[in-house]
Structure formats: structure tokens, C-alpha cells
Amino acid sequence: MRRFCARRALGSLAMAAAVGTVSACSAGHTAVVDTSQASSDSASTSLTVASTSAATSLDFTTTGGAAIPAVLMDNVYETLVRIDEDGSITPGLATSWEISDDARSYTFHLRKGVTFSNGDAFTAGTAAFSINYVREKWTNGISAAMDPVAKVTATDDHTLKVRLKQPSNGWLWSMGTATGAMMTPNGMDNLAAQPVGTGPYEVSRFAPSEFVELHVRDGYWGKPAAQDVTVRYFPDTISSVNALQAGGVDVVWGVQNPELLDDVKEGIATEVGTTNGEVLLSMNNARAPFDDPRVRQAVAYAVDRSAANDILWNGMAKDTGGAPIPPTDPWFEDKHYYDYDPDKARQLLAEAGAEGAEIALTTPTLPYAQTVAELLYSQLTEVGFKVTLESAEFPAVWLGQVMGAKDYQMSLISHVEPRDVPTLF
């Protein structure tokens, strides 16, 4: 039976204010494999997965976004620790570890007999190289997760000691994310197309924005769940669901059109749950008119999050109440900081002298973003903004222009914090 999985269906429209949460199934890093529970005979199967989050490169040391880790983590790359489905830190390539009384020294005991796909042995030396590479070479902003590290030492082939500058509540967790991916010095020449890791798969073919083919490799220390895995990229959810119903793919994840769940054929299983991602509307407070907090507050009051939920997500989203914190977060509080109040929005604009303020909303070329942008255009225009909608190709242009260069006034994105990526997919 083919499986339709709403791996990221909705999203919380958290406006510097906010709106809703996303429907999705929970899994490990990716929908492709679960190496911890695979049976010995399951590796005779193949699997084709559909996604609308296309990877243009396989090098997440230089390229931001979740599309690359979604495919590579746990499949090609592995980490010293893993984040399981309930958010607990569990053994990975490290079988155990100790933390010093001052919470600054971590001693990891590494799994023996592990090799990289190029034949190199996984040792404490390669683990130290991987951590230092993040600190010294990565240009992806998530490399900041390694800022707490002061020194890394391989005390023997299977013992790694990491000394932090000061105690960190988040550092060990980050070692289960993409920043904790274990690499080898001999595998760095072609990260964009031929990554080398300790995972059950290696990349057999990659066509940017089209597909990634993974083939189970010889010598893996565990048991892969499928012999061959293909991740096919589609321009939108509708085309990916059509491919599922035609038998062209086995799994669809990242569904951002929940109404499609009503139309799938009998015999196709669906799963819907709550994700830890949210749809964020971001206002650049370094640029007018959003350098005035009253204008930002006016936007928050102008957005009818309940209407957005009903119109865009069939009422399946969770309203985060104006805060960019998903309900899966232990610090989530079910409060409404900015209730819909267009009169209050107009009042704030008048106080700020910003009536008729011209703003550009730059949206990534993703189906949900374009739909949300049209609704926001209507709601913001109603309270007195003059809105221009602009599109930025995603990921190539949007990541560089908006996320990287901060060259925007207002933008939106379905977002997940780097610390939450391991439990999103």
C-alpha cells in the first residue's frame, strides 16, 4: 500500500506576531529510512519519496535550509548522538558519554568497526576533524551551534573529549543535528554532489532540483530499511500527489495543501500530526517603516490568523497566538498576544505617521507562501498599507537575498529552528 504522509502540512503563521502550526507526521531526520528498526530482509525493497523542498546542492556546510539535511542526515551522514521522536538524546556513533561535574567536559566513547562510504575508518580523529571543520570552515549560519566549543581532543581511536568554553544546555542536542554530521578529511572534495558519510546509503546520482538517488552501501554497521531510495522533487504538492496516485512515487511528505487529503484514492494511507515548524512573517526592523515598533504591531493586529487557518489550512493549523513558538515546544504558552483588531492596527499606523506606508512582501516561490501572501495583501491593504508582492526563487534567490543578505522589508517562510530539524522530518 502506498503511503501519503503529510510530513509538513500546515505551519504556524507566526508573525513577529503569528498564526498556526503545521500538520505532519513525526519521524527521525527523514522519511526515507529508519536504520534502527529495519529487518534483515527489508533491504531488498526500493522506495521513491516525493518532496517539494528541492535541494540544489548537497553541501549543507555552505548552503542553508532544511532540504539537504532532510535527505542526507541518518541516510548518508550520521552523528555521535541521535534525537529520537520524543526529543530525547540517544546513542548514535557514540555508544555512551560522560559529562564532567562542571558541565564543560564531554567524553564520548565511539562505536567500533564503523567505516565511511569511501572505506576510511571512523575514529575519534575523524570526529575531532568534523567538529573543528564546523568551527573553522562552515559558512552556513547554523555553524554557530559549535561556538561553545573550546577544544576537541582524540585521546585514543575510540575516545573523544570535548571541552566547552562554558556550560551549554543546547550543545549536546546540536550534536544530533546537521552540525554534528561526521565527515572524513578524504571526503571533502565534492560535498555538493558526492558526500561521504558513515550512514547506510551513498549518493549514486544527483540532479539538482530534480532528484537524489541513494543506494545501500557495503560495509554499513547497521541494517538499512531499503535497498534503493529515490527522492524526487516536484514543483508543488498537487503534482506530487498526482504522482502518488498514478503509482510514480511511494510516499509524499511535506504536504502543504491539506485539502488534498480528501481526494486521495482508497488504499493510500494518510498520516497527519503536529510538527515543530511554523510559518513566520518576518519584518525587517532595520528598514523603514518597520524600524518603528508601532508599525510592526499594526501588522500583527491586521492579520486575521483564524481566517488564514480556515482559508489556507482547512482549520487544521494551531494558532500560536502571535508568538513564533510551536505548541510542541516545552516553553509554549497558549496565549494570544495580538488578537485580530484592524481598528487598533489603523490607530497604531496613525500614531506612527505611517498611514499609506509602502511595503514590499517578498515571498519564496513555494505554493503555500504564494497563497499566504495573497491573503496578507488583502488584510494589510485593508488597514492602510500599500503592499507590493514580490517573488524570490526558492531556495537559490530567497536564501541568499532574504535569509543571507537581509535584503527585504517583509517576508514569510515555513520555518523550523535548527535544533528542531532532527525531530521534524
Can you say where each PLM-predicted feature lies in the sequence?
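N-terminal lobe/hinge region of extracytoplasmic solute-binding protein
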Residues: 50-101, 132, 196-197
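Aromatic- and charge-enriched surface segment that lines or borders ligand/interaction sites
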Residues: 95-139, 155, 161, 289
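Surface-exposed binding/hinge segments that line
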Residues: 109, 143-185, 205
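Gly/Pro-rich hinge or "lid" segments in bacterial periplasmic/extracellular proteins
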Residues: 167, 175-224, 228
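Ligand-site clamp/hinge motif
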Residues: 217-262, 386
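Periplasmic-binding protein-like
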Residues: 262, 286-328, 371-372
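Structural transition elements
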Residues: 314-351, 368-371
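Ligand/substrate-recognition segments at binding pockets and active sites
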Residues: 346, 350-417
